[in-house]
Design a protein with these regions (language model features):
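Active-site cofactor/cluster-binding pocket
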Residues: 1-214, 218
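Gly/Ser/Thr-rich loops at beta-strand to alpha-helix junctions
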Residues: 9-12, 128, 137-139, 223-228, ...
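Phosphate/diphosphate-binding loops
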Residues: 61-63, 69-73, 77, 81, ...
Length: 610
């Protein structure tokens, strides 16, 4: 695992993304993690890349290779470098404690050499690419392929920008780092089992393309971090499929536009982060009452209020399920990985159409911004081409008591001349407003029962690890990878533990109680607060649903993703585990005191670094 630590204006996210995309194109598995400040003025920032030829599920607990651009970068992140790791630092700005013999130190005057290489034309603005050249040399990366990635990134800019970036890269690549680092490393290429081409993208991109594959052609939104990049992809791509995405004047307008598109016969999407979802709440409640299909993406961030706009949290689960006045049924899904962002969008579109209901997709900042490589989807089997059914009907009831609502697009001929209405007021089967107590009870049950029917068709996720035993870890969203790595490590140390990951959060799949019966305790792992009653948001739902006192939770609210060590320490309090690194079959890193022991790192690391 490589961690770049500097300031947000240094372009370390760009450099890290280049590494990730190179890894994906080289058929390696990859996962990234980044933090950026919420202020316009910028501040400390990191970008880390974990690369391997095996399955990479989490971003990693400790770095094998740390790049420090500033003194604060060194001081804040040296604790994340594992013993025997390499510290590459800008000797123009950093003075490390060389008496600390746990690490190997490589000091390079990065700032000065960058300015010198670029002739002062861009000052030190190319030092991120200079460092990329250094890393490429140290890790024996494909320099020509990396240059192509750089060129593609800046292809829309003036040619001088491309040339400057390539000059900075070449200067870093040519630096005689071998004079101070005697061992170079390379990633062994292991063909992927699927044999299919890989694509590399972040979670928001995967979500946007999944929506398109699922047949979404229209949508509207309002910019907010971290949802905005979904909008950017949809605004660029939807016109290629005959659709359009509108940037509305506010959140209420955006959800209203999307609802109009859906009623016209084309399933539409809107989205935001927590604050924007609060503003959309009334219209989403209207969609529940009118039974209009719509997809609502909530890219969760730290809250409440403006909160932590660039940090991760899973604190909007209750908002998604209960965030409306009255009994307002809706479906809530959560992707587990970047790849799953693509497939969960297709699932959301299917459910919205079949059950004429609002469907929430709860992603989060970690999934939105991290880059992963995965097998290219077979669009020939997945792509949905939406075509509204304008076939004339003899008659049409939009709200039959004993059936699921399916609206006909406006303009469809109704031969008996009885055209239905669309109302947010309680209504009868034709949509006419009514205050009948009997009808309100019947319609409330109708809207509720379609979610019960959905629960019957949701498959229960498979348990990873022990199928029965002492502890079952239950997660949702981006906690998938760290939980699975924690379970593997715990089982390697003799614990009888399994993991269950939920993609369908509301309604829950039927049959979970049979799984819970097989374990002595159930612990949800969540990035939200334990609340007044001492349980995370998912744990609260599960305890209410199953009345099971053995359900507890391990939660945190620091705005950072879970580390494997955190989960192990939080769930198995008082127990120590022999391995503090994440087990990786075929990867052997020997750690001993003294910087000279970096020489014990294997030249060929079959499963990657970290």
């Amino acid at each position: 695992m490589i961690r770049l630590a500097g300031n947000s204006q240094d372009g370390i996210q760009t450099a890290g993304a280049f590494l990730a995309r190179l890894a994906g194109r080289s058929e390696h598995d990859v996962m990234t993690y980044m933090t950026i400040p919420a202020t316009i003025s910028g501040g400390p920032s990191i970008f880390q890349v974990r690369i391997g030829s095996g399955e990479v599920l989490s971003a990693g607990d400790e770095a094998d290779f740390l790049v420090a651009f500033y003194q604060h970068s060194y001081q804040d992140h040296i604790g994340f470098l594992r013993e025997g790791g390499v510290l590459l630092y800008d000797s123009d700005n950093v003075e490390p404690n060389l008496d600390d013999k746990r690490f190997f130190y490589v000091g390079v005057p990065i700032t000065g050499l960058t300015v010198e290489a670029l002739g002062g034309t861009a000052k030190d603005k190319g030092k991120n690419i200079f460092v990329l050249g250094l890393i490429a040399k140290i890790f024996n990366l494909d320099a020509e392929k990396l240059k192509r990635v750089i060129t593609e990134k800046f292809s829309g800019k003036d040619q001088s920008v491309v040339n400057t970036a390539l000059m900075a890269f070449q200067a870093g690549y040519a630096y005689p780092v071998g004079n101070v680092l005697t061992k170079h490393y390379r990633f062994e290429h292991i063909p992927r089992a699927s044999g299919r081409a890989q694509i590399t993208m972040d979670g928001n991109q995967a979500l946007a393309y999944g929506l398109i594959a699922g047949g979404v052609r229209y949508g509207a939104g309002y910019p907010i971090t971290p949802w905005s990049s979904v909008m950017e992809v949809l605004r660029r791509e939807l016109p290629k499929y005959g659709g359009i995405f509108v940037q509305a004047e506010d959140e209420l307008a955006s959800v209203s536009i999307a609802l109009g598109c859906s009623y016209s016969g084309y399933l539409a999407v809107t989205g935001s982060a927590g604050p924007g979802i609060s503003l959309k709440a009334e219209a989403i409640g209207w969609a529940s009452m009118a039974e209009i299909p719509i997809i609502i993406c909530n890219i969760q961030r730290g809250g409440p209020s403006t909160g932590l706009p660039t940090n991760v949290e899973q604190s909007d689960l209750h908002q998604a399920i209960f965030g409306s006045h009255g009994d307002s049924p809706r479906v809530v899904l959560a992707p587990a990985s970047v790849e799953d962002c693509f497939y969960i969008a297709i699932e959301a579109a299917r459910i919205a159409r079949k059950y004429s209901t609002p469907v929430f997709i709860l992603s989060d900042t970690s999934l939105a911004t991290r880059i992963e490589a995965f097998d290219e989807p077979d669009l020939s089997k997945l792509m949905v081409d939406p075509k509204p059914d304008l076939t004339p009907r003899q008659t049409h009831k939009p709200y039959p008591i004993d059936q699921i609502t399916h609206h006909v697009p406006p303009g469809t001929r109704i031969l008996d001349g009885k055209y239905p209405l669309l109302a947010g007021l309680e209504h009868d089967e034709m949509g006419h407003p009514t205050g009948s107590p009997k009808l309100h009870m019947a319609m409330t049950a109708k809207r509720r029962n379609k979610l019960r029917k959905l629960a019957e068709e949701i498959p229960v996720s498979e348990i990873y690890g022990n199928q029965e035993g002492d502890t079952l870890l239950v997660g949702w969203g981006s906690t998938y990878g760290p939980i699975h790595d924690a379970v593997k490590m715990a089982r390697d140390n003799g614990e009888k533990v399994g993991a269950l990951h939920l993609r369908h959060l509301h309604p829950l799949p039927n049959g979970l109680e049979k799984i819970f019966d097989k374990f002595k305790r159930i612990v949800t792992v969540e990035m939200n607060d334990q609340g007044v009653y001492g349980f995370g948001q998912l744990a609260t739902i599960l305890r209410a649903r199953y009345c099971e006192p053995k359900i507890t939770s391990f939660t945190k609210t620091d705005g950072l993703t879970f580390r494997v060590k955190e989960i192990l320490d939080g769930v198995f309090k008082g127990k120590s585990f022999l391995a503090r690194h994440i087990p990786r079959e075929g990867a052997e890193v020997i750690h001993q005191a003294g910087a000279e022991n970096v020489k014990t790192l294997k030249e060929v690391v079959p499963q990657g670094v970290g």
